[in-house]
Amino acid sequence: MGRFLFVASSACWFVFLSLSGAKGNNCPQDWLPMNGLCYKIFNELKAWKDAEMFCRKYKPGCHLASIHLYGESPEIAEYISDYHKGQSEVWIGLCDKKKDFSWEWTDRSCTDYLSWDKNQPDHYQNKEFCVELVSNTGYRLWNDQVCESKNAFLCQCKF
């Protein structure tokens, strides 16, 4: 009997902790919760810098999204496919400020994962220094693009 109570109480404690963690996410409706952050696609077309400024003004600590694991890509791609109204590419927070193929995230997190489309990045005509998710790859692969191009964009925030 004592062993059963221990197992039952341990199981209840595990369920409680699991539910507490899920609730602690607090992402608003139509945002994607993932790894303690919330992601939202904005369909308004903006240049990369304007998109980053929009994310920062939306809520302190928000930025264009950074992607750090292969496992995050399919979830983000599915979310964008569900909520993106249009065919444009989607800005993320990766850029090459130094214009020397040293890519950095706007949230200053480590550049520990890259998912370039075929033959990318190429800095085509020495003009492409901002990164977009490519629509014809299902938003899974990246392309460097002219920063003044107008795209939808993906913000990440902590709520």
Swiss-Prot record:
Site annotation Binds aminoglycoside antibiotics (subunit E'): residues: W103
Residues reported in the UniProt entry to bind Ca(2+): Q120, D122, E128, N143, D144
Signal peptide coordinates: 1-24
Domain C-type lectin: 34-156
Regulation: Hemagglutination activity is inhibited by lactose (MIC=2.5 mM), galactose (MIC=10 mM), and raffinose. Is very weakly or not inhibited by gentamicin, kanamycin, glucose and sucrose.
Chain ranges for the short sequence motif Galactose-binding as given in the UniProt record: 120-122
Site (described: Binds aminoglycoside antibiotics (subunit A)): W105, S109
Residue numbers marked as site, Binds aminoglycoside antibiotics (subunit A and E'): E104, T111
BP terms from Gene Ontology: negative regulation of cell growth
Biotechnology remark: Can be used in the treatment of bovine mastitis, since it is able to both inhibit bacterial biofilm growth, and disrupt existing biofilm, without affecting bacterial cell viability.
Gene Ontology molecular function terms on file: carbohydrate binding; metal ion binding
Family as reported in the entry's similarity comment: Belongs to the true venom lectin family.
Name of the protein: C-type lectin BJcuL
Native source species: Bothrops jararacussu
